[in-house]
Amino acid sequence: MNLPSPLDRLRLPIIGAPLFIVSNPALVIAQCKAGIVGSFPALNARPQSLLDEWLHQITEELAAWDSANPDSPAAPFAVNQIVHRSNGRLQEDMATCAKWKVPIVITSLGALEEVNKGVRGWGGITLHDIINDRFARKAIDKGADGLIAVAAGAGGHAGRLSPFALVQEIRDWFDGPLILSGAIANGRAILAAQAMGADLAYIGSPFIATEEANAAPEYKHGIVEGRAGDIVYSSLFTGVHGNYLRRSIEAAGLDPDNLPEGDLKTMDFGGGAEAKAWRDIWGSGQGIGAVTAVQPAAEYVARLAAEYAKAKAELLLKTA
């Protein structure tokens, strides 16, 4: 399908996923300059007043880039909003996003019609992340413009479904923008996501191992050194199932193979408990085996571009 504005001006079919604590203006700006959507969670900007400063910085730097590089303008950026009832900042954060006319808003953990209407009112679009077809239908019913299918293997809060099954079920009825998340970390995986019916790939964990990311050196090296077998799926830490690096769980004195279930009722995005969980226990997806070094975000995106072009060429030879 032809993607709607502003998703139609990417140099690569990628959205850099919003990473709690890790994503910051430096990373977002680097991603956008490299030609992919850069994003960050609104809750990363603490206190709330910092969100206005971040959006000013991102908007100003990308505008300056576009003026200096008219032949390779920056991709748009996105802000992730947690729509869960425990997020007491939502209304104020949305007002700040409206002030800066944020082009893309990614919504999570709840779909609200008024949020989607608000974004559309200032000319933006909303993408809602979901883990199954039922939630996908609810999101579109509430007015989301597109969907992010979070399949098995994705970093952070993630679903259990195969990407083949999840994309298939959604594409049976939805022909709008569809982004796939789950262990996508190289150019071949981006092409595979498109082949199964997604429009764009959603890549998060590899960007933890970038120079711009707000992550401890040990966290970055854990991504570089980790493999799929080093990822643990648990609901203990936030009340919602997610994927985490085994070594960080062990460092906290816990047994990764014997973790109790978390309680969904304890999920709280307003009091800082989430920040503590994600700072001590490191989220990561299963695709990190493709990450080989800590490097600038632009270098990683350039590598993805080369791999993506090579994968397309090789596939054409196989099908000729």
Give the role of each language-model region.
Residues 160-179, 185-320:
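Conserved active-site-proximal phosphate/metal-binding subdomains
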